[in-house]
């Protein structure tokens, strides 16, 4: 699989008005299966995307890997009494809507998240994401797009992974892009997903992108920040859609999802 690096500069963006609010089952246990992010480095993933409550300035992980907040991210402000999960680069709340205020990366993993102590977690670099998705042994057999009970996203499987009996997966990416392309590639039931989770599978929902007060590309694309700057105004993110995965340079004031890891 070839990794593309490009800039998102002026593409037409479709506004999707559906939201997927987090439900409230008990949180899943932390994921423990290791993923290689370099030849000599492994990590384990948090069990859900990072979420922030601005008014109380508290953090937590989504209760389930498939959870994402959606359009209510548009209310992102220091006085918002609700949860958000699309962050500006290395920050929660910028002083205004320009990338000039976001000159320093502050790793979300250094924060106190739920009951975890400071510095428990960290953010992957662009090189680590590239190695995990494209360069580790059998990488093309450890990645897939899918729709899980109507939630589109990217599946990642741990090192030395074996598929559970009775589940026949299609690895890789769809032949075309679009919201429906995920399900057309493959659809998983909640029972199948629970089986995959038990084997250490990670799911990154296609949680979209926040630009100022607009939320776009929900269930079309996933945008996940890396710890890597590109230049003074842009930083690198992992971007996937149904038919490809890329590392993109995007404006630091865009709101994107965050999935943290800890060293294994």
Which residues does each PLM region occupy?
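Terminal low-complexity, poorly structured segments
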Residues: 10-11, 27
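C-terminal motif of bacterial Sec signal peptides marking the signal peptidase cleavage site
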Residues: 16-19
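Processing junctions and N-termini across compartments
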Residues: 11-14, 254
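Bacterial N-terminal signal peptides that target proteins for export
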Residues: 1-9
């Amino acid at each position: 699989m070839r990794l593309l690096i490009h800039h998102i500069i002026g593409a037409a963006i479709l506004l999707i008005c559906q939201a997927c609010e987090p439900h409230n089952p008990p949180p899943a246990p932390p994921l423990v299966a290791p993923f290689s992010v370099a030849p000599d480095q492994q990590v384990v993933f948090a069990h859900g995307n990072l979420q922030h409550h601005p008014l109380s300035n508290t953090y937590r992980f989504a209760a389930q890997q498939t959870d994402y907040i959606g359009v209510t991210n548009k209310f992102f402000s220091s006085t918002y009494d609700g949860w958000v999960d699309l962050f500006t680069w290395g920050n929660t709340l910028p002083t205004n809507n320009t990338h000039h205020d976001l000159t320093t990366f502050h790793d979300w993993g250094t924060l106190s998240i739920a009951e975890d102590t400071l510095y428990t977690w960290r953010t992957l670099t662009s090189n680590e994401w590239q190695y995990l998705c494209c360069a580790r042994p059998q990488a093309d057999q450890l990645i897939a797009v899918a729709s899980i009970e109507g939630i589109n996203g990217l599946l990642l499987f741990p090192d030395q992974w074996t598929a559970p009996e009775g589940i026949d997966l299609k690895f890789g990416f769809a032949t075309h892009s679009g919201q429906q392309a995920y399900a057309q590639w493959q659809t998983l039931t909640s029972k199948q997903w629970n089986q995959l989770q038990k084997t250490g599978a990670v799911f990154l929902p296609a949680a979209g992108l926040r630009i100022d007060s607009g939320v776009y590309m929900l269930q079309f694309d996933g945008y996940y920040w890396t710890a890597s700057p590109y230049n003074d105004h842009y930083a690198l993110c992992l971007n996937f859609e149904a038919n490809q995965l890329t590392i993109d340079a995007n404006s630091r004031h865009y709101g994107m999802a965050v999935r943290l890891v800890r060293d294994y």
